[in-house]
Amino acid sequence: MADEFGDGDTVELPVGKEAVDALIRENSHIFSDTQCKVCSAVLISESQKLAHYQSRKHANKVRRYMSIHQGEEFVSAKKFKAAPAESSDGDDRSKCCPICNMTFSSPVVAESHYSGKTHIKNLRLREQGGVTEGMLHQAKKLVVTRTPTIATKIDNRMDQSDPTKFCKLCHATFNNPLMAEQHYAGKKHKKQETKTQLMTIYTSSGHTPAQAPIAINVNSPLPGSGSAGKGFSCDTCNIVLNSIEQYQAHVSGAKHKNQLMSMTPLSKEGPPAAGGPSALAGPPSTGGALSSGGPSARGFSASGGPTPKGPSSFGGLPPMGGLMPPPYPPPHSQPYVREDMMGPDGYTYFNKDF
């Protein structure tokens, strides 16, 4: 039975239940039937307790614990918690060290920390009014937390008129002039600049479809606008092109020109020529006296038949039957005039026997 730890270099394993119980009684401040504080283990049964205290793993941790605390008296858990010398804000001393900003998984680890050089150094600095590592760590967290807010305020107050800090064309911000120079020399900025120049030339030309063969109506983005970089739009053909080369090829192609000519408004027609469609006789009027235009005004020819309305009546050509427009040449200087008669019922008719 090993009821003594010796100098901490060698630890004998207890054998049997009696040896384990004796070990627990002699070291009750770190061992118990339900918990091993050195290993931070919870023991829920008798068999588990025996297996744990008789294991080599437990013995190695006890040996390491003894080597750290060699020559020191064991401090009970109650005394360990009751020492408020270095506690802060009510925190448990065995769980965290506010001076070094460290947390512990067990009282053994906490005691090892408090006896180490780092804690002693930070404690001395705190007593002298210096800055400890825990204070530095907290200050770093505070700086990291406040940095995005400060950066946002700086961006909001940034002078966008300074080209070394902001590119209006690409909506890009720069931290230093070297970054701005690299941006302005890059392909992305040059492509955006060429696109804006092309759009400015086309939109400021002021040409109309009747004046220029390649007049366009483009809903182009203005320099520095938010719509920059989304393609080249041709409202005439209702398409969007991806590059400047495609746009130039489109506006110089036959499809765009045909679409442009189809949108050109037609000119108003002049008065019809003599003998045109307007020379056709209109529909006969109803009611009272007839006009003095003779039978041709009613749609009848001199022979008593209807006037033809075919293609021969266009272009000043004489109608079918050899009749010519007045004045008639001799011996036909007096054309036939129909005699209209008025009946007793008020209707107009012509005499067949005339």
Swiss-Prot record:
Zinc finger (Matrin-type): 34-64, 95-125, 165-195, 232-262
Positions with biased composition (Pro residues): 324-333
Primary location class: nucleus
Keywords for this protein: Cytoplasm, Metal-binding, Nucleus, Repeat, RNA-binding, Zinc, Zinc-finger
Extent of Low complexity compositional bias: 270-289, 310-323
SUPFAM superfamilies given in the database record: beta-beta-alpha zinc fingers (SSF57667)
Residue ranges the record marks as coiled coil: none
Amino acids binding Zn(2+) 1: 36, 39, 52, 58
Region spans: Disordered: 263-343
Name listed for the protein in its UniProt record: Zinc finger protein 346
Species of the source: Xenopus tropicalis (Western clawed frog)
